[in-house]
């Protein structure tokens, strides 16, 4: 068995096999275009790849690899993100996925990575057997309160590429004091935003939408929100505010709610740090996040147990 980068026919085979699980309502052709378009972004060309465990030319298991940077306890570390771990049905139960993950972690260690990170949709037990440890994170359901005395007094505009450097700065402010947070460059932000926009654009008309808005002062973004609407409901994918109270973010959501008053209060859900609580919203409930965040050290001395309440990881970055 050997670990190889999946391209050409192997990549085509993997995309065909994984489509029934992760097709997201796309056609099979659109699903393949979605992955390839992510790879074609500036960040994706060098930091997103697909890998396969092969024997005799046969794909035994496959996974995506994301080359990430993160901050933990004031240190910047390299992190190997692992996603879409898949074994063809006829080959399951033989330990191929275990061997693949071990090989990816060993390769990450050789490349200087300190941690491997994944998000499990199948519970924690399986990946705990592979040496991962769950980091409990939560998702909040939030009701946006109506503005008082008419329309909210904040001006917003659609966000675009020119805003990403400023948003990267807002993200850097948000991670101060975090027990674990990604280092989010402008190129990385362009990648994760493109991933959502491509999914909406390649899917059936009207199934999904992506809303990206900023508030600016002196031609610089001082707050932003990214909201998606679709089969998973209204998701507050990402947000940031130069004001620690989050009042601008709250006011921006009030503006979005005011566009459709007949629909009633705007309700969104997302991974929101408990310390971030704008006065314009009310937390309806808090539940464990559906995708379980899990870490595994790539080297023996690098065990990491970040305080869950201090993890900063927006929904937009989950893979």
Show the residue positions of the predicted features.
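Mobile, glycine- and charge-enriched loop segments
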Residues: 72, 77-91
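Conserved GNAT acetyl-CoA-binding A-motif
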Residues: 106-120, 261-272
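Conserved beta-strand in the GNAT
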Residues: 50-52, 58-68, 81, 86, ...
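Active-site rim helix/loop that mediates acceptor-substrate recognition in acyltransferases
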Residues: 15-71, 180-210
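Active-site/acyl-donor-binding loops of N-acyltransferases
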Residues: 125, 131-150, 226-319
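Amide-forming acyltransferase catalytic core, primarily the GNAT-like/NAT-type
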Residues: 133-238
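Core nucleotidyl-transferase/polymerase catalytic module
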Residues: 45-46, 60, 66, 83, ...
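Conserved acetyl-CoA-binding loop-helix of GNAT-fold acetyltransferases
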Residues: 84-87, 93-106, 245-259
């Amino acid at each position: 068995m050997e670990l190889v980068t999946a391209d050409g026919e192997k990549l085509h085979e993997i995309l065909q096999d994984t489509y029934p699980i992760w097709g997201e309502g796309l056609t099979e052709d659109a699903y393949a275009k979605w992955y390839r378009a992510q790879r074609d972004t500036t960040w994706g060309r060098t930091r997103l790849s697909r890998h396969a465990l092969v024997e005799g030319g046969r794909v035994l298991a496959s996974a995506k690899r994301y080359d990430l940077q993160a901050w933990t306890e004031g240190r910047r570390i390299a992190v190997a993100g692992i996603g879409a771990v898949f074994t063809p049905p006829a080959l399951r139960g033989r330990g191929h996925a275990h061997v693949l993950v071990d090989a990816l972690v060993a390769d990450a260690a050789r490349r200087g990575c300190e941690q491997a990170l994944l998000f499990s949709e199948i519970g924690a037990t399986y990946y705990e057997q592979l040496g991962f440890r769950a980091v409990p994170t939560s998702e909040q359901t939030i009701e946006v309160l109506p503005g008082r005395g008419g329309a909210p007094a904040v001006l917003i505009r659609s966000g675009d590429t020119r805003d990403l450097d400023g948003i990267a700065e807002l993200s850097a402010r948000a991670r101060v004091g975090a027990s674990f947070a990604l280092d989010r460059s402008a190129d990385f932000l362009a990648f994760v935003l493109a991933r959502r926009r491509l999914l909406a654009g390649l899917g059936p008309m009207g199934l999904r939408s992506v809303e990206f808005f900023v508030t600016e002062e002196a031609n610089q973004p001082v707050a932003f929100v990214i909201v998606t609407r679709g089969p998973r409901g209204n998701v507050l994918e990402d947000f940031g505010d130069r004001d620690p109270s989050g009042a601008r973010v709250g006011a921006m959501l009030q503006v979005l709610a005011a566009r459709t008053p007949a629909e009633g209060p705007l309700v969104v859900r997302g991974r929101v740090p408990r310390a971030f609580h704008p006065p314009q919203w009310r937390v309806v409930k808090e539940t464990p996040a559906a995708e379980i965040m899990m870490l595994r050290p790539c080297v023996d001395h690098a065990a990491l147990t970040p305080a869950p309440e201090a993890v900063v990881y927006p929904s937009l970055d989950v893979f």
